Swiss-Prot record:
Keywords: Cleavage on pair of basic residues, Disulfide bond, Hormone, Secreted, Signal. One of its GO terms (cellular component) is extracellular region. Disulfide bonds join 35-129, 47-142, 128-133. This is Relaxin-3. One of its GO terms (molecular function) is G protein-coupled receptor binding. The gene is RLN3. It comes from Pan troglodytes (Chimpanzee). Belongs to the insulin family. May play a role in neuropeptide signaling processes. Ligand for LGR7, RXFP3 and RXFP4. It comes from the Eukaryota. Heterodimer of a B chain and an A chain linked by two disulfide bonds.
Amino acid sequence: MARYKLLLLLAVWVLTGELWPGAEARAAPYGVRLCGREFIRAVIFTCGGSRWRRSDILAHEAMGDTFPDADADGDSLAGELDEAMGSSEWLALTKSPQAFYRGRPSWQGTPGALRGSRDVLAGLSSSCCKWGCSKSEISSLC
């Protein structure tokens, strides 16, 4: 009889949710679960999306002060460019696309050569989606 009461008490305890929230509470301090676009947005936010905007504004302000008379030289440079493109020297320097790409490795490259960083990203994104990850783990991708 005591066995049945113990089993009934255990069943009521599980059904009321006393067992499951405790397991979730232990996993919560690890990090936030991020999947798909949410993971990408978190990486961009963590790696300094606002710094890109700030550096763009600062670069624009610096260029405005550095090149005050660029418009005056623009017409003469455009004329020189037209002359150079019309000359036979320009045509001698150009190559066909086949000759240009012949000496370079193909876009495919050696199999697995550049996949290391992608594998790290894929591993972290899948673990962030399954178990969650902290901000310090996301910042390791920067």
